[in-house]
Amino acid sequence: MAGLSLEFTVNTWNLRSLSQVPCPLRHGFRFPRRLTRRRTILMCSDSSSQSWNVPVLSSYEVGERLKLARGGQQFLAMYSSVVDGITTDPAAMVLPLDDHMVHRGHGVFDTALIINGYLYELDQHLDRILRSASMAKIPLPFDRETIKRILIQTVSVSGCRDGSLRYWLSAGPGDFLLSPSQCLKPTLYAIVIKTNFAINPIGVKVVTSSIPIKPPEFATVKSVNYLPNVLSQMEAEAKGAYAGIWVCKDGFIAEGPNMNVAFVVNGGKELVMPRFDNVLSGCTAKRTLTLAEQLVSKGILKTVKVMDVTVEDGKKADEMMLIGSGIPIRPVIQWDEEFIGEGKEGPIAKALLDLLLEDMRSGPPSVRVLVPY
């Protein structure tokens, strides 16, 4: 390049004489198998004679720096099929950079709450990640029961009784190309995070998201490609709102960035939720629909429906709520510039939240898996 001269010197050690030997610039660097501690200096000179001093670290030094960087994190245990084991050292909770989930987004994930020593809706979330993996054409590294056993054991090793279990299925490490054909094998990762499951029943404001919604083929897969979701959330926060609401091209309400939505209409007697055809099928949302039948039995609600909901109808609803495993139900009192109902938290959202919390604490074995600590 005209006007720019490069002078790279990498000081390595000769194994016999321990004298420094210059290594010319190539496409990569070849290091001796045994090295003493050293500092590599990469000199890049141009008209301004700039230089940088970048240390080359031993594996021990890398580990020590990672421990400092991870200080205070509540990461209690991680499983990686790459090493086929569980670690409780946060500094060791790393992924290969050549994993296609990292550099190509070819991976899917899911989560399950840990509540009082039980995994809530583990089977439902596990079924969903397996569907997502199939749609993303990611082969399974293990069968379903083995994956479930690994997830439960990871929580058991962590000792966490209240927190979150997150897990991923990836095309796996192999190279930095687009196709996964050279990936060694698909991978499973899982991590246990200690969190405070705080319930906030205070109503929030939402806004209509201007970020393009994912097409159904991708919206129905819980993949790691969350850039639209992140941008939607950032847009909402910049407008002083809790979340953004996506609307499909036909004008029907879709979902939030990581939650479903529901409405109470017809004088507070009907619970309606947008169809799941073009959005991610929410496990907590589906469980809420099941629990809502108890309100029908008590005469509090007349019907529970899954149907198309227009923005106009949604904004005219008596109540609106967001539903997701981390919330789990949050009332919405304002959408854009319009108040929902009376502009305050409604009774149905509270009743559904109470039912869901009771289900999390003492629900049937179909939704609660005991962790053997």
From Swiss-Prot:
The modification N6-(pyridoxal phosphate)lysine is found at K222. It is found in: Plastid, Chloroplast. InterPro entries: Aminotrans_IV, Aminotransferase-like, BCAT-like_C, BCAT-like_N, Class-IV_PLP-Dep_Aminotrnsfr. The active site is at K222. One of its GO terms (cellular component) is chloroplast. The keyword Aminoacyl-tRNA synthetase does not apply. Residues 1-57 form a transit peptide. Its main location: plastid. Pathway: Cofactor biosynthesis; tetrahydrofolate biosynthesis; 4-aminobenzoate from chorismate: step 2/2. The keyword Plastid applies. Pyridoxal 5'-phosphate binds at R128, E255. Gene3D superfamilies: 3.30.470.10, D-amino Acid Aminotransferase, subunit A, domain 2 (3.20.10.10). Its cofactor is pyridoxal 5'-phosphate. It catalyses: D-alanine + 2-oxoglutarate = D-glutamate + pyruvate; 4-amino-4-deoxychorismate = 4-aminobenzoate + pyruvate + H(+). Inhibited by hydroxylamine or amino-oxyacetic acid. Its EC number is 2.6.1.21, 4.1.3.38. Keywords: Aminotransferase, Chloroplast, Lyase, Plastid, Pyridoxal phosphate, Transferase, Transit peptide. One of its GO terms (molecular function) is D-alanine-2-oxoglutarate aminotransferase activity. GO terms for biological process: 4-aminobenzoate biosynthetic process; tetrahydrofolate biosynthetic process. Homodimer. Belongs to the class-IV pyridoxal-phosphate-dependent aminotransferase family. Amino acid aminotransferase showing activity for D-Asp and D-Ala as amino donors with 2-oxoglutarate as an amino acceptor. Can also use D-Met, D-Tyr, D-Phe, D-Gln, D-Trp and D-Asn as substrates, but no activity with L-Asp, L-Ala, L-Leu, L-Ile or L-Val. Also catalyzes the reverse reaction where an amino group is transferred from D-Glu to pyruvate or oxaloacetate to produce D-Ala or D-Asp, respectively. Also involved in folate biosynthesis, acting as an aminodeoxychorismate lyase converting 4-amino-4-deoxychorismate (ADC) to p-aminobenzoate (PABA). This is D-amino-acid transaminase, chloroplastic. It comes from Arabidopsis thaliana (Mouse-ear cress). The lineage of its organism: Eukaryota, Viridiplantae, Streptophyta, Embryophyta, Tracheophyta.
